[in-house]
Amino acid sequence: VHNEDNLIIKAAILLQKFTDTTLGAEFKIIKKLPMGGGLGGGSSNAATVLLALNTLWETNLPIKTLAKIGLSLGADVPIFIHGYSAFAQGIGEKLTPFYPKEYFYLVCKPNCSISTEYIFNSAELTRNTSRLNINDINIEQCRNDCQSLVIKHHTEVANLLAWLIEYAPSRMTGTGACIFSRFDSIEGANQVRLLLPDDVESFVAKGINNSPLHLALKMLNK
């Protein structure tokens, strides 16, 4: 990714300009999330940079200010900056804390990539879904309107999703192409992972309701 398109560099430059600091930083990236998976890797990177540099450079901006800066980089950035599980409204900037059970997840990426721009601009995408209220939300009844559109046009996603559902509750991430399956134990997730086809990227992760980055920064600031 060229620097002008890299959210890490963009986030650092925005913070520099906002705070008038002349300080800099070097970045080393260890890529773990699959490309084009719909897991918010770019947004998470941007949020991490804003939070870490705010501490490193001692610019001491409040979280709400960092979230506003992050919103200009992407709708998903604020939730990573706030660092807690949340019910999102608007374009993603209106957050209400929401703490589901911390399950284990098998995350799989079929051998394809999905264009987020194409999905959001598609005339086939459902746009009249009833609005959900945090007070009466049942997470089991929620759905991803993008999922039905993606599986209609991408057999790789459709086939993998159908296979995973036989083992555990499974859904697509965002606009895809990753699918996450929910398990009560890491052993259960790993057992199914061993059965996956060789061309499917996968990893097992534990759901967490609070960001470990926030905890680490609190320790540094003590």
Regions from the PLM with identified roles:
Residues 8, 37-65:
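DPxDG-like acidic metal-binding loop motif
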Residues 25-37, 170:
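Short pre-catalytic strand/loop immediately N-terminal to key active-site residues, enriched for Gly-Thr
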Residues 3-10, 44, 114, 155:
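Conserved active-site and cofactor/substrate-binding residues in soluble primary-metabolism enzymes
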Residues 1-23, 203-220:
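N-terminal beta-alpha supersecondary unit
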